[in-house]
A protein has these predicted regions:
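Glycine-rich, Lys/Arg-enriched anion-binding loops that position phosphate/diphosphate groups
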Residues: 136-254, 258
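Gly/His-enriched, cation/cofactor- and phosphate-binding structural elements
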Residues: 202-320
């Protein structure tokens, strides 16, 4: 049965776009309306970011009403449960339907996410994206610099004065609904990519754990390029300093330092400072590895044309 999803009209923000996009993914047979008319809202199956009610079981997801107390909870350093980021519409919808959204998107991409995996992906996505949408909407954080944050990107799709001044009310409402659907498509695509990457990490995890280790266990050797390894190595392999793997085109083998923590730009170790920014013949001369290709100036990745060359570079880096 077609689900009627309602949100407010006028200017949209990331939280209402995101919430509606999530529901649209969970319920592919749907219609979206934008209104503040209480009578029309009352007929909707879901009402997002308008209506003055937070009642998930009834499909109501507003956060503007007086007395609203919805917030995430986290454990502090002492193990006590404390209030964290306050919900906006995006977080309210995600808390209720995030896992189902992940499973629906995974299925649409030809994969399966069981309840455990889907719950983990949903939690990761809330931590990486949804809570920031909520923070911005609630005025608790600034948008990303420039126009690169998702909230700013979606805001750019709103109609502007030059367009609005030429349209009557009916034409303007139609254009705003069209732009809202454009914004929903951006969110849907972003969710798809996040879910696909997360499933890839889950599928690859077993291969990463079983991969060969050399140099007394300090170098992990992956036989397939492009495999997501960072989370498993950072969280489960404290002794691994470097990861060696073929470039996706197999034109070279690369060695990469392991981040000190997930999301960190600091590494457990750096490559030799003398290699920084060198390429080809210069790097070969300085390193003593004939087929050395490059070393990034920030000393976190380097490469050679052969596996033997990359492993030799890894051994030299560890021997410093």
């Amino acid at each position: 049965m077609k689900q009627l999803i309602a949100t407010h009209d006028g200017t949209f923000h990331a939280d209402d776009v995101f919430g509606v996009a999530v529901l649209a993914a969970v319920f592919p047979d749907h219609e979206v309306i934008r209104t503040r008319d209480p009578e029309r809202l009352s007929r909707a199956d879901f009402v997002v970011d308008v209506g003055g009610t937070w009642e998930p079981a009834a499909g109501r997801f507003d956060h503007h009403q007086r007395g609203f107390t919805g917030a995430r909870t986290r454990q502090d350093a002492d193990g006590q449960v404390v209030r964290a980021e306050v919900y906006a519409a995006a977080g309210l919808v995600w808390a209720e339907h995030g896992r189902a959204c992940v499973q629906q998107l995974a299925q649409s991409l030809g994969h399966r996410a069981d309840d455990v995996l889907a719950a983990r992906i949903a939690a990761d996505l809330d931590d990486a994206l949804v809570r920031y949408i909520d923070l911005i909407d609630n005025g608790a954080a600034d948008v990303a610099p420039g126009i690169f944050g998702l909230s700013s990107q979606l805001a750019l799709l709103n109609t502007g004065w030059l367009e609005e001044r030429q349209l009557d009310a009916q034409a303007l409402a139609a254009l705003q609904l069209e732009r809202f659907h454009e914004a929903m498509a951006v969110v849907h695509r972003a969710l798809q990519r996040f879910v696909l990457r997360a499933i890839g990490q889950a599928v690859a995890a077993g291969d990463v754990r079983g991969a060969e280790r050399v140099a007394q266990g300090r170098v992990l050797l992956l036989r397939e390029g492009g495999m997501p390894w960072t989370r498993v190595v950072v969280e489960e392999m404290p002794e691994v300093m470097l990861v060696v793997f073929p470039e996706s085109s197999r034109a070279q083998y690369q060695l990469r330092t392991v981040p000190a923590a997930l999301g960190s730009f600091a590494s457990r170790m750096d490559l030799p400072a003398a290699w920084a920014g060198l390429r080809d013949a210069q790097l070969a001369q300085v390193s003593g590895v004939p087929d050395a290709v490059f070393c990034h100036k920030n000393l976190f990745i380097a490469g050679a044309r052969s596996l033997e060359g990359a492993l030799r570079m890894a051994a030299l880096a560890l021997a410093r």
